[in-house]
């Protein structure tokens, strides 16, 4: 079971802010679209997708004994124009550094998208997820079809 708590902090004239605490004791600050003291909830959903797939991919690559020396993920999303503004399209770009077999990366991303990443499984219900990767410095870049 996953647990969490939200506490609302209000300051006169300064907007609204929630301090969220996970069941494991980690805290983060959320703010609304008008505030600048924390992430918006929709941003956290996108970051959760990136974190979910990143952990999957890096763990799979390590099990395949790939020499990953650096890893970044860049995410962009389009949202529905009317409320609720759910994601309609998400672009995920994986950038990996090291001596890495492109087939291993392709397989790791595929497993994340089709088996392991629960956040991706939820977001894919409303959004088309498009994934690319590149291995640097070799510069191998490939576009992957949506796994769903």
Where are these regions (language model features)?
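Extended beta-strand/beta-hairpin segments
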Residues: 1-47, 58-148
């Amino acid at each position: 079971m996953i647990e969490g708590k939200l506490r609302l902090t209000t300051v006169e004239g300064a907007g609204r802010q929630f301090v969220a605490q996970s069941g494991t004791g980690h805290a983060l600050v959320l703010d609304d679209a008008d505030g600048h003291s924390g992430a918006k909830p929709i941003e956290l959903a996108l970051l959760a997708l990136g974190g979910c797939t990143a952990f999957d991919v890096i763990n799979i690559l390590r099990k395949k004994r790939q020499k990953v020396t650096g890893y970044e993920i860049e995410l962009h999303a389009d949202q529905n124009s009317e409320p609720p503004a759910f994601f309609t399209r998400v672009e995920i770009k994986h950038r990996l550094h090291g001596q890495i077999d492109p087939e291993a990366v392709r397989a790791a991303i595929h497993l994340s998208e089709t088996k392991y990443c629960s956040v991706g499984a939820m977001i894919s219900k409303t959004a088309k997820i498009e994934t690319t990767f590149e291995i640097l410095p070799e510069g191998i870049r490939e576009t992957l079809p949506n796994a769903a």
